[in-house]
Regions:
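Gly/Ala-rich beta-loop-alpha elbow adjacent to hydrolase catalytic centers
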Residues: 117-122, 126
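Short beta-strand/loop motif that positions the catalytic acidic residue
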Residues: 272, 278-280, 284
């Protein structure tokens, strides 16, 4: 972690580590209210960056919104892969780590199904898991999750299609997080800068004697530093899993074609029948809506909902729109489906 951010606190909602395997940890957040919905919620974050964007600070926390509405909430922390993890595959993550974590959640809760909330590429893992283990998934919520990668609406898609991923993985083994971060920044540098600094610019007009405004200004700066910390915290990527994801999804578009294979099993999105909530950000510069919208027609779920919010890729988790509309929609959608 870069030294300037070492003292910046993030992810402060109390939790306990209830399972770990290799670098992966399963975090169980402590409840904030007595009345709990029976079905536990398991947030599956992406490999890129860190899970605590879902709990950046108390007033910008998807996790706290879930807890305050009575949801028993867990999240996966993928940790920081090292050289001995270079050969991990998507099968290791889905049928290994995720499956073991869900078994532990079911053991602790006494409930035989969980609600999955998949975030970005963690949503792809959640889709794959729901196909392979439908008996363990009560509800499926995905945020900013791509399924149709055949689009030129994002530079990320264009670059990934032309990437020599074999050369990259064969050379590095573990794809460096710093390299990933540079690539993601240059997908849309102007929007990324605006998103990062907007919270600070909102408070630069304080009068010297306006104590309340100056306190808010200080909190805006702290929010900015937390975002900087998160944006600089980039784990490396297990080479073989990264190779498979880039080739199968971005370059061959196998997921939406129902031709992706995990451990000898075909991933057919039509096998998804549980209730589905598909959420996306209108101004997402990484995962264009055109990549996420086809999911609802690709699954067999009779109970399925789609929502698009006027925010960006990160704003959907920490922005004003997230706290005002996105989180309430998730919790209200889940309540009648969590018993």
């Amino acid at each position: 972690m870069p030294e300037p951010y070492a003292g910046i606190s993030v992810g402060t909602t109390p939790f306990e580590i209830v399972y770990s395997e290799n670098k992966m940890r399963l975090l169980h957040y402590l409840p904030t209210v007595k009345k709990q919905h029976p079905v536990p919620v398991f947030i599956v974050y992406a490999f890129v960056n860190r899970y605590y964007i879902m709990d950046l600070q108390p007033d910008k926390s998807v996790v706290r919104k879930l807890l305050d509405e009575g949801f028993d909430t867990y999240i996966v922390d993928w940790g920081y892969p090292s050289g001995d993890d270079r050969h991990l595959t998507l099968n290791d993550y889905v049928n290994g780590y995720l499956n073991s974590a869900i078994d532990r959640i079911m053991e602790l809760s006494g409930i035989d199904k969980v609600t999955l909330i998949g975030v970005c590429h963690g949503g792809v893992l959640s889709l794959i898991y729901s196909v392979l283990h439908p008996e363990k998934v009560k509800n499926l919520v995905v945020l900013n999750t791509p399924v149709n990668f055949d689009t030129d609406k994002s530079l990320l898609n264009i670059w990934s299609k032309s990437m020599d991923v074999d050369r990259l993985v064969d050379y590095y083994g573990i794809v460096p997080g710093e390299l990933m971060n540079i690539g993601y920044f240059f997908v849309d540098p102007l929007r990324n800068i605006i998103d990062l600094y907007s919270g600070v610019y909102d408070r630069v007009d304080c009068e010297p004697d306006d104590i309340k405004c100056r306190r808010q200004d200080g909190e805006s700066v702290r929010t900015f530093l937390r975002m900087m910390k998160w944006g600089s915290d980039n784990p490396g990527q297990a080479g073989e899993a990264y190779r498979q994801f880039i080739k199968d999804c971005y370059q061959k578009n196998l997921l939406i074609k129902n031709e992706m294979e995990i451990d000898g099993q075909m991933i057919n999105l039509k096998d998804i029948t549980m209730p589905l909530l598909n959420i996306m950000a209108k101004y997402d510069n990484f995962i264009p809506n055109e990549s996420s919208i086809p999911l609802n027609d690709a699954v067999s779920s009779a109970d399925k909902t789609m929502a698009i919010f006027p925010t960006g890729h990160i704003g959907i988790f920490v922005g004003y729109e997230s706290q005002k509309d996105v989180c309430p929609m998730i919790t209200e959608w889940l309540k009648p489906r969590s018993f």
